[in-house]
Swiss-Prot record:
Keyword rRNA-binding applies: yes
Name of the protein: Small ribosomal subunit protein bS18
Gene responsible for this protein: rpsR
Free-text function comment from the UniProt entry: Binds as a heterodimer with protein bS6 to the central domain of the 16S rRNA, where it helps stabilize the platform of the 30S subunit.
Keyword tags: Ribonucleoprotein, Ribosomal protein, RNA-binding, rRNA-binding
Organism the protein comes from: Tropheryma whipplei (strain Twist) (Whipple's bacillus)
GO annotation, biological process: translation
Length: 83
């Protein structure tokens, strides 16, 4: 364990923030497997907003379409290693 001086914290170095990614989800449908696969991990989980670059509203639409596709049997609930 190192010694930590009490008092003020060191200011963080200025970091360059990347601009948000643009995600096009126009016409996203639960039947379009190719477009839904972009938002699923290899294990079948829905990817986070910070990974996909989607806005809050877009992420809700993506999640709704994926969950609908799971219910309809277009994509499995789980994928990857099975027990």
């Amino acid at each position: 364990m190192g010694y930590r001086a009490k008092g003020r914290r060191q200011p963080k170095a200025d970091s360059v923030v990347a601009p948000p990614k643009r995600v096009s989800i126009k016409g996203l449908d639960y039947k379009d497997l190719a477009s839904l696969k972009r938002f699923l991990s290899d294990r079948g989980k829905i990817r986070a907003r910070r990974v996909t670059g989607a806005s809050i509203q877009q992420q809700r639409q993506i999640a709704k379409a994926i969950k609908n596709a799971r219910e309809m049997g277009v994509i499995p609930f789980k994928s990857g290693v099975s027990r």
